[in-house]
Each structure stands twice: as structure tokens, then as C-alpha cells.
């Protein structure tokens, strides 16, 4: 079992089937990482479990049925969101062909009908009004907005997974730091930076 009963309650993953698929997903990462460099070679089993907890914690902040995970890499958090939210459409975007190949295998192996894969850069992808953007801290929030602001709209909300509060200095945008429930489990600083248009 991936999580004890207390952690299951905090993370909202009491369904045995979902837990099994999450476990299968982690095993696929470990297997493919030997040849594909999906995550750092130094990543331990405990590190992967912590990544999983971080990604599961974002579920509490999701209030839409369309999610866009940019720079998804090995599928964190997109695959985790898709596995635990079967009614939510999750688009996973990455410019690395090898990582998209891995995600294609994961989608088929775990029968993820609500996951859609896109081999492209965020600069070349137009975000729909309904999509919530999620991402790990690939870059600073300021660099991220500079990169994607031509492709988003006033309704776009971004949730960036971070370990500390960060400010944004681009005119027209605001941020809100949200504490993650993962802090209770990991005993480490964890949170989300909510980035949105000032009008939103």
C-alpha cells in the first residue's frame, strides 16, 4: 500500500483501484527511467513517493473539468490528476519526444481515456478559456508568464507547484500563495502559487 490510512484521508485517495494504478505508474517510471532519463537517476523510491504526494495534493485546488499540464515530463502532476479525477480531461504537454513516448505507453497501460498528449512547446499551444494550467516549478513565475502570456487569456489561472512563496513582477498579473496539504505528510514546506490576471 502506497499510503497509510491517515495519509489516504488527507490526500483523498481511499479508492483501492486508484492506489493500485498510482503504484503501477510509479513502477513504470522506475522501469523506463533506466533508459529514458524521465527523472534524475539519483531519484529514490522515497523521492518518487514525495513527488506523488505533492501531485495528489493539487487535487484540492482543482475546480474545473479541463486541465493543462505544461512541461509534464514523466507526467507529474498530469498523470496523477488524470488517474484520480476520471471525469476531468487532462492535456499533458511536453516538447521532449522520448517523454511523450513514455506517456503514450502509460496512457495505454493504465487505460487513461481522459488523458490527452501533446508533443509541442507551450509557446505554440493556445490555451482555452476553460483550462486550468498546472506545472511544477520549471522556471520562475515571471519567466513562465513571459513565455506564455501571448497564448493565454484573462480567464487563465495557473497553479505552479512551489516550495516557497514567490512574487511576480509582470504588470497585469497577481499571485496568491496556497499552503499544500502535503506539508502535513512530508513535514516540509510545500505550496502552490496561483497566478492570474488582475481582472480575474
Language model: regions and residue ranges:
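Class I SAM-dependent transferase core
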Residues: 1-64, 68, 98-99, 105-115
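Conserved beta-strand/loop positions that form the S-adenosyl-L-methionine
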Residues: 70-72
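S-adenosylmethionine
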Residues: 88-91, 95-200
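Conserved SAM-binding loop of SAM-dependent methyltransferases across substrates and taxa
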Residues: 74-87
Amino acid at each position: 500500500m502506497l499510503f497509510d490510512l491517515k495519509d489516504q484521508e488527507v490526500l483523498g485517495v481511499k479508492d483501492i483501484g486508484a492506489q493500485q494504478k498510482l503504484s503501477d505508474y510509479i513502477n513504470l517510471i522506475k522501469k523506463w527511467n533506466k533508459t529514458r532519463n524521465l527523472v534524475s537517476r539519483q531519484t529514490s523510491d522515497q523521492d518518487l513517493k514525495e513527488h506523488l504526494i505533492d501531485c495528489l495534493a493539487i487535487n484540492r485546488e482543482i475546480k474545473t473539468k479541463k486541465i493543462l499540464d505544461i512541461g509534464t515530463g514523466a507526467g507529474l502532476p498530469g498523470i496523477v490528476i488524470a488517474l484520480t479525477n476520471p471525469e476531468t480531461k487532462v492535456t499533458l504537454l511536453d516538447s521532449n519526444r522520448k517523454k511523450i513516448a513514455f506517456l503514450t505507453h502509460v496512457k495505454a497501460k493504465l487505460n487513461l481515456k481522459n488523458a490527452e498528449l501533446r508533443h509541442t512547446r507551450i509557446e505554440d499551444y493556445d490555451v482555452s478559456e476553460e483550462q486550468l494550467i498546472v506545472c511544477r516549478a520549471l522556471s520562475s513565475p515571471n519567466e513562465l508568464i513571459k513565455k506564455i502570456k501571448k497564448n493565454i487569456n484573462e480567464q487563465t489561472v495557473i497553479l505552479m507547484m512551489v516550495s516557497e512563496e514567490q512574487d511576480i513582477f509582470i504588470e497585469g498579473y497577481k499571485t496568491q500563495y496556497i499552503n499544500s496539504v502535503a506539508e502535513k505528510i512530508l513535514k516540509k514546506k510545500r505550496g502552490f502559487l496561483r497566478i492570474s490576471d488582475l481582472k480575474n
